[in-house]
């Protein structure tokens, strides 16, 4: 069968193992061809090709439900569900999404992008099925890295107490998340990977009893209990965690043996109640470079298939904000043993891999457990350490209660560095860092800031660690501005103080963080039209530099705020609120991300669509204030506030 002819996964039914293995080769070929050309997640999907084929052999996806955790391993699923022809548009504007989206396909039963949600969602579907008297299978596919998340364990705890609810969890154990997984559960799973399949030991005992003349067909409960004891004795501790939580444990099964997995899934579907099938896979299977470097090939930009090397950018770029942060933190840790870096399974992405390599004793990876990371840091701060939590903006929102309850209320000196703040591009709405400004500015005792460039990032990190209270620092994805960096000796900033970058009399532009450089370019565009603007680098969201901003606003009378975050409750809202509190009557135009989802596209494409490029912002400012040669003196905009 040609993969290009598959539009429905039920077309796999009836194929021989050899035919399915041929389809597996075609999936890997298409997967590699597209990702090597346009970039995307590589290792996760390559590791679950056979798993996907075997599972879909045993399901009727016109009715049955499959929830893929996170979604970055679901490229084979997409190729089997009618998206082969469009797969070249993967993660591109208006193309196939990199994660699952209910709006994209009827086979995407639950959208995702963050880890550890699949078991809860699939269990919810199973309960809805039973309450409505329907009959279909519900399956969650979750990786061993995502299983470290508290939400996944909460769902397992719940499902295990529902013995009459048929429900299947497939544990895709590749011994990796993005970085190698950590913790006792991961260690336990690693031991299990190398153990004999446990359910088949139980099955063998029961089959032997069934063959006993006269009594075999009537297996008493005592014999069933005995088989459970044999399982525990034969393979000590293997699967015991899940068995004790109420699941029937099956495995570990070779995740690249289609026939064995098909038999296992068929057997699992016949068991009533919750079942966990443990499948051992290799991340990056079938592509030697991805198998050898499973962290580096988790996700890739465009690369050469023959050499495995990334295709270099045509123009050299400055170091990324993440790298500058990591390098600076290493320098600080070398001088202060009380500073500790904490990550939630994102060491490489946040730059903390540099600290891990340089000073491992001052580095902690808690796994995919953002809530735990925040409260762990709070506990460390209670006893004299200076923890620095480096977490993506989109993932930190998972620990909102801990930010308030465990850090903010207790006024503890924990520093949060929010990487990927703002528009991140091809990963789409689940990964945009557009909400941290709004949710952090509401938390008491927090000092919140964002740098205009990588040199200011260095000073802000020192500022955070010099402050006796909770601090948050947002940095964007991608390269810095290319400014000169100091190796050491960074002076802390005065908290709550911004700076004037240029002066003009017609307009006051107040920009925050990554929007400062675009604000300066916007001012130059306006200057070409004879409009002079004062540009302020706000530096701080909380507290605002009202002593700088308010007198200028009163004098100039026209104010524009710029932020790379949602306008609802954002930086612009903070400015407008401060004007209202002081009865400052000015006309204010807020520029940022409107009340909408930002879908997958390149960051530049998203900014163009949102009107966040310097040219677009200059044009909109001229329209807003009647400087566009129109007859109207005043063009209203939905983002405008007049105080």
Curated annotation (Swiss-Prot):
Gene3D superfamilies: 3.40.50.920, 3.40.50.970. It is an enzyme of class 2 (transferase). Binds 1 Mg(2+) ion per subunit. GO terms for molecular function: 1-deoxy-D-xylulose-5-phosphate synthase activity; magnesium ion binding; thiamine pyrophosphate binding. Mg(2+) binds at residues 144, 174. Its EC number is 2.2.1.7. Keywords: Isoprene biosynthesis, Magnesium, Metal-binding, Thiamine biosynthesis, Thiamine pyrophosphate, Transferase. Thiamine diphosphate binds at residues 72, 113-115, 145-146, 174, 287, 370. Pathway: Metabolic intermediate biosynthesis; 1-deoxy-D-xylulose 5-phosphate biosynthesis; 1-deoxy-D-xylulose 5-phosphate from D-glyceraldehyde 3-phosphate and pyruvate: step 1/1. GO terms for cellular component: cytosol. It catalyses: D-glyceraldehyde 3-phosphate + pyruvate + H(+) = 1-deoxy-D-xylulose 5-phosphate + CO2. Its cofactor is Mg(2+); thiamine diphosphate. It comes from the Bacteria. PROSITE patterns: TRANSKETOLASE_1, TRANSKETOLASE_2. Homodimer. Belongs to the transketolase family. DXPS subfamily. This is 1-deoxy-D-xylulose-5-phosphate synthase. It comes from Prochlorococcus marinus (strain SARG / CCMP1375 / SS120). The gene is dxs.
């Amino acid at each position: 069968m040609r993969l290009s002819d598959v539009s429905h996964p039920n077309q796999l039914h009836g194929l021989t193992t050899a035919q399915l293995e041929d389809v597996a080769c075609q999936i890997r070929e298409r997967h590699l061809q597209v990702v090597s050309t346009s970039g995307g997640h590589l290792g996760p999907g390559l590791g679950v090709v056979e798993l996907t084929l075997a599972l879909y052999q045993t399901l009727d996806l016109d009715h049955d439900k499959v929830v893929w955790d996170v979604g970055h391993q679901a490229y084979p699923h997409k190729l089997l569900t009618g998206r082969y022809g469009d797969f070249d548009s993967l993660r591109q504007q208006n193309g196939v999404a990199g994660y699952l989206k209910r709006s994209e396909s009827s086979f995407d039963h639950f959208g995702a992008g963050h880890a550890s949600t699949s078991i809860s969602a699939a269990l919810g579907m199973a309960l809805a099925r039973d309450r409505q008297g329907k009959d279909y299978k519900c399956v969650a596919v979750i990786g061993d890295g995502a299983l470290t998340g508290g939400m996944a364990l909460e769902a397992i705890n719940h499902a295990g107490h529902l013995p009459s609810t048929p429900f299947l969890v497939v544990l895709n154990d590749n011994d990796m998340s993005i970085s190698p997984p950590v913790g006792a559960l991961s260690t336990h799973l690693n031991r299990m990977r190398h153990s004999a399949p446990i359910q088949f030991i139980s099955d063998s005992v029961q089959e032997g009893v069934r063959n006993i003349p006269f009594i075999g067909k009537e297996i008493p409960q005592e014999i069933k209990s005995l088989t459970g004891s044999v399982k525990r004795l034969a393979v000590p501790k293997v699967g015991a965690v899940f068995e004790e939580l109420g699941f029937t444990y099956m495995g570990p099964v070779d995740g690249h043996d289609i026939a064995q997995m098909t038999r296992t899934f068929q057997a699992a579907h016949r068991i009533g109640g919750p079942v966990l099938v443990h499948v051992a896979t290799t991340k990056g299977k079938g592509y030697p470079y991805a198998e050898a470097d499973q962290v580096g090939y988790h996700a890739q930009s465009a690369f050469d298939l023959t050499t495995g090397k990334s295709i270099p950018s045509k123009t050299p770029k400055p170091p990324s904000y993440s790298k500058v942060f990591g390098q600076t933190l290493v320098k600080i840790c070398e001088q202060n043993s009380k500073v500790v870096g904490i990550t939630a399974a994102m060491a490489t992405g946040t730059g903390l891999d540099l600290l891990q390599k340089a000073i491992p004793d001052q580095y902690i990876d808690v796994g995919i457990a953002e809530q735990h990371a925040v409260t762990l840091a709070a506990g460390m701060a209670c006893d004299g350490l200076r923890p620095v939590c480096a977490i993506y903006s989109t993932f930190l929102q998972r620990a909102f209660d801990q930010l308030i309850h465990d850090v903010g209320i207790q006024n503890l000196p924990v520093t949060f560095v929010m990487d990927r703040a703002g528009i991140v591009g091809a990963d789409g709405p689940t990964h945009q860092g557009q909400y941290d400004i709004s949710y952090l500015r509401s938390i008491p005792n927090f000092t919140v800031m964002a740098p205009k460039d990588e040199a200011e990032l260095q000073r802000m990190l020192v500022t955070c660690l010099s402050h006796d209270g909770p601090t948050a620092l947002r940095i964007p994805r991608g390269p810095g501005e290319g400014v000169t960096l100091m190796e050491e000796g960074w002076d802390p900033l005065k908290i709550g103080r911004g700076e004037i970058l240029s002066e003009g009399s017609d307009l006051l532009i107040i920009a925050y963080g990554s929007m400062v450089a675009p604000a300066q370019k916007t001012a130059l565009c306006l200057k070409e039209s004879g409009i002079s603007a004062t540009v302020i680098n706000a530096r701080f969201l909380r507290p605002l530099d009202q002593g700088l901003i308010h007198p200028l606003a009163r004098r100039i009378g026209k104010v524009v705020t710029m932020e790379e975050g949602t306008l609802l409750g954002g930086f612009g809202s903070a400015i407008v609120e401060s004007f209202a509190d002081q009865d400052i009557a000015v006309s204010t135009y807020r520029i940022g991300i409107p009340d909408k989802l930002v879908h997958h596209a390149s960051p530049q494409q998203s900014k163009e669509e949102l009107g966040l490029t310097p040219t677009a912002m200059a044009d909109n400012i001229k329209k807003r204030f009647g400087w566009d040669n129109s007859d109207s003196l005043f063009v209203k905009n939905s983002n405008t506030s007049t105080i």
